[in-house]
Regions:
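Conserved short alpha-helical segments that host acidic/polar catalytic motifs at enzyme active sites
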Residues: 1-223, 228-287, 293, 381
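Secondary-structure transition/capping motifs at alpha-helix termini
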Residues: 129, 150-151, 284-288, 306-313, ...
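Short acidic loop-to-helix transition motifs that present clustered carboxylates
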Residues: 139, 297-298, 317-322
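Extended, hydrophobic alpha-helical segments in both membrane/secreted and soluble proteins
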Residues: 290, 297-301, 312, 353-374
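Hydrophobic, well-ordered secondary-structure elements that form the walls
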Residues: 304, 360, 382
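Short, glycine/charge-rich flexible loops or terminal/linker lids adjacent to PRPP-binding catalytic cores
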Residues: 309-354, 365-368
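Short beta-strand-centered segment that lines the nucleotide-binding/catalytic pocket of NTP-utilizing
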Residues: 386
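Conserved small/polar residues in nucleotide/adenosyl-binding loops
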Residues: 390-394
Length: 394
């Protein structure tokens, strides 16, 4: 893998009765906004009639009250927030994707990236498929619809398609009567589900989105598992479970996920605290203050402080209107955002030996700029500690 990528957030809701599933999906996507800020979309299913809207931009900007009203009520909905991994940031690559086929229709949203997308795309094009986007999500949707020609049900088509798609993926799929959740055999990307007090099933990339809509967490979806939600309840297809070792991306705990999420039974907040404590044990230093780089470095900084006994302070003020720097598309955009995203609190660092905790180094864009900011604010010494180092040629 030549560069590190964050791969979006997915959300789905299944209800036994028609209700405002669009608003529920909106709030779920809002809770997942940290996973991608390029584009977002929602598809609502009202008794087999699909209504969708998607565009570039943040959830709060794209889904105005008028747009939510236009989506209307339904009993199933899926949604997506995107950070591009394959395909450009154009509106055409926004998700979910809606596909009409000879046996009905389907909507699909995808978190991840395939390693055999190019091979599958060429195969499908030779068979006559016409692609309207450059994302591999459309490849997945065409593979499923192709399998649906001979499969007795949409879930069996998905089960057969899983044999063909290789890579990291968590999917939410909507048919006229079902919501389907799929996690790849390695469990590389997170996916979980829960239930609201009024009996609606919720699927999401992270448990924080369940909290946002008042759903009780039931469990994580297993690596390789397909979970089907319909009028008969919930059932699981585990034909692909246990075929590969678990391999959740470590960046989920270090950077991608919100600290209030629980992934595969482990609190993200606790994982970051432990990472900071480990840093203090492995790389101690004489210093006056510990600070963290907002937001994902804060928990680790607190862990470092507790383990080392060095006081923890808030060292930076973050401009909350600036998106996450690493997942901003384009190097120039990332550099510009760092300049206005963070400002050190001079009285905390001036004349002091500072331990600065960051979650990771990928491109080094943020780190170099932040060290310069601390020097300009008068820090006597700067001791940088990093939870995870990732070598990238990006």
């Amino acid at each position: 893998m030549s560069n590190l990528r964050e791969e979006c957030g997915v959300f789905g809701v299944f209800s036994g009765e028609t209700n405002d599933v669009a608003s529920t999906t909106y709030y779920g996507l809002f809770a997942l906004q940290h996973r991608g800020q390029e584009s977002c979309g929602i598809v609502v299913n009202d008794d087999g009639v699909f209504t969708d809207y998607k565009d570039t931009g943040l959830v709060n900007d794209v889904f105005t009250p008028n747009i939510i009203d236009r989506l209307g009520e339904g009993n199933i909905a899926i949604g997506h927030v995107r950070y591009g991994t394959t395909g450009s940031s154009e509106r055409s690559n926004a998700q979910p994707i809606v596909v009409n086929h000879i046996k009905g229709k389907m909507a699909l949203a995808h978190n991840g990236n395939l390693i055999n997308s190019g091979e599958l795309r060429r195969e499908l094009e030779l068979e006559g498929s016409i692609f309207h986007t450059t994302s591999d999500t459309e490849v997945i949707s065409y593979i499923i619809t192709k399998e649906r020609l001979s499969a007795p049900s949409i879930e069996q088509a998905v089960n057969h398609a899983v044999d063909r798609i290789k890579g990291a993926y968590s999917l939410v799929i909507m048919s006229p009567s079902k919501l389907i959740a799929v996690r790849d055999e390695n469990g590389f990307r997170p996916l979980c589900y829960g239930i609201t007090k009024d009996g609606r099933y919720i699927v999401a990339s992270e448990s924080c989105a369940l909290d946002a809509v008042g759903a009780e967490f039931i469990r994580d979806i297993k690596p390789g598992e397909i979970v089907v939600f319909d009028k008969n309840g919930v059932r699981s297809i585990e034909d692909h479970c246990g075929k590969a070792p678990g391999a959740l991306c470590v960046f989920e705990y270090i950077y991608f996920a919100r600290p209030d999420s629980v992934i595969d039974g482990c609190s993200v907040h606790s994982a970051r605290l432990r990472a900071g404590a480990f840093l203090a044990l492995e790389h101690p230093v004489q210093a006056d203050v510990v600070i963290g780089v907002p937001d994902s470095g804060l928990d680790a900084a607190l862990g470092y402080s507790k383990q080392s006994g060095i006081p923890y302070e808030i060292g930076f003020i973050k401009n909350k209107y600036i998106g996450r720097t690493f997942i901003a598309p384009g190097q120039k955009s990332r550099e510009d955002k760092v300049k206005i995203k963070l400002n050190p609190i001079a009285e905390v660092v001036k004349g002091k030996r500072v331990v600065m905790i960051d979650d990771s180094i990928v491109r080094g864009t943020t780190s170099a700029r932040i060290v310069k900011l601390l020097r300009e604010a008068g820090a006597k010494e700067i001791h940088m500690r990093v939870c995870l180092l990732y070598t990238s040629d990006a």
